[in-house]
Amino acid sequence: MAKKSLIYREKKRQKLEQKYHLIRRSSKKEISLIPSLSEKWKIHGKLQSPPRNSAPTRLHRRCFSTGRPRANYRDFGLSGHILREMVQACLLPGATRSSW
């Protein structure tokens, strides 16, 4: 299980990302529409003004049950070893083990 402080930090980043999403998107759109380089640099400065944790690349998907940030399957929201355990226990409908 991940530390609660890490899970809380991730939730805080998600809130920040949602808060500054429109500002980032509008600034990027302005940069693509303006031809002059000097104005692009000014808008780029505005793009750097939001907090660093509000960037979408700072977010991690975490396992629903353990909070593990790596080896997550998007379809299930689970990490690999938890997914394997649940499939073996027949807790995920429609998921089967491969055999050939």
Curated annotation (Swiss-Prot):
Its main location: plastid. Signal peptide: none annotated. GO terms for biological process: translation. GO terms for molecular function: rRNA binding; structural constituent of ribosome. PANTHER family: 30S RIBOSOMAL PROTEIN S14 (PTHR19836), SMALL RIBOSOMAL SUBUNIT PROTEIN US14M (PTHR19836:SF19). Belongs to the universal ribosomal protein uS14 family. This is Small ribosomal subunit protein uS14c.
